[in-house]
């Protein structure tokens, strides 16, 4: 029940922002729903030697993405009961985008739980990708393990999101970037992401960044967060250095962390994580599991 109410609320925020801008004098507009429609998605692999830039532009609703060994770049389904949500596919050279259709409204949309918009997409595991996810207020579940990601860039609004790398990323990832608003975000298996640099920026909310997995190379991580609780998990035995800056925040450590002023470290062997954390207020938790 709570999740349903949360999704309705964030859909309003996202679509007002995307379609109308902020205007408190706008009238309330009923969102017209109809029978549920399901579109089959099948996007061929572009004929190019370049890394494919794949963009998923999603306004509000629910999205699920997972890897799949297949002959096409993307397969899956999109289900919706608002005709304006019909997805649009654009492809040119190495650029591919799937985007939610624009909702045509003249005021503030009045949503209830009958409004549906669900994406379920499978991504090709063997094609090198720069994956860009641009979303509004939504619920998302991304299983990205086993893909060939060279860059990952996620930007979303008020969101409830789980990202997981349950298997190693098959490519070297130059940069992993996640920028979110007031959200609840969990990133698991980051050791499998095979990244060189990671940037995580957030507003108020609750965030968990777990670097479990098979860390293949040194990684540099920058975390900037507002009034929030940020949990960073580094498995015991992985060398790590965390530098913290946050005048109105405090740090709680659990496990094998050693403190020296605003610096926290853990001994280990193999590739090292260097993490810089800046917080406006709240709590930083450092854990081993």
Range-by-range predicted roles:
Residues 16-19:
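C-terminal motif of bacterial Sec signal peptides marking the signal peptidase cleavage site
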Residues 39-45, 76-80, 84, 95-112, ...:
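Short, surface-exposed interaction patches in beta-rich subdomains
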Residues 26-99, 114-134, 139-155, 162-168, ...:
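Short linear S-[DN]-x-LW-Φ motif typified by the pepsin-like aspartic protease active-site region
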Residues 156-158, 180:
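Periodic small-residue-enriched repeat registers in elongated scaffold domains
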Residues 21-23:
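Bacterial signal peptide processing site
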Residues 1-6:
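Positively charged n-region of N-terminal signal peptides that target proteins for export
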């Amino acid at each position: 029940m709570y999740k349903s109410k949360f999704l309705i609320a964030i859909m309003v925020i996202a679509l007002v922002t995307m379609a109308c801008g902020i205007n408190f004098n706008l009238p309330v507009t009923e969102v017209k729903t109809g029978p549920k429609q399901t579109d089959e998605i099948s996007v061929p692999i572009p004929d190019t030697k370049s890394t494919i830039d794949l963009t998923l532009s999603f306004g509000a609703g629910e999205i699920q993405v997972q890897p799949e060994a297949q002959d096409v770049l993307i397969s899956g389904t999109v289900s919706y009961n608002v005709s304006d949500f019909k997805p649009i596919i654009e492809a040119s050279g190495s650029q591919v985008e799937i985007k939610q259709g624009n909702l045509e409204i003249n005021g503030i949309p009045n949503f209830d739980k009958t409004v549906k918009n669900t994406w379920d997409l499978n991504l090709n595991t063997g094609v090198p990708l720069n994956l860009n996810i641009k979303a509004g207020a939504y619920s998302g579940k991304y299983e990205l393990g086993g893909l060939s990601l060279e860059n990952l860039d996620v930007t979303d609004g008020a969101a409830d999101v789980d990202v997981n790398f349950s298997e190693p990323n098959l490519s070297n990832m130059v940069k992993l970037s996640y920028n979110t608003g007031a959200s609840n975000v969990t990133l698991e298996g980051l050791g499998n992401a095979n990244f060189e640099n990671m940037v995580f920026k957030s507003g108020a909310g609750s965030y968990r960044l777990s670097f479990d997995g098979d860390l293949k190379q040194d990684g540099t991580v920058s975390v900037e967060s507002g009034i929030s609780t940020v949990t960073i998990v580094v498995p015991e035995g992985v060398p790590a250095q965390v530098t913290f800056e946050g005048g109105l925040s405090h740090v709680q450590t659990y496990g094998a962390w050693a403190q020296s002023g605003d610096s926290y470290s853990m001994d280990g062997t193999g590739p090292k994580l260097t993490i810089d954390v800046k917080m406006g207020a709240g709590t930083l938790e450092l854990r081993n599991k």
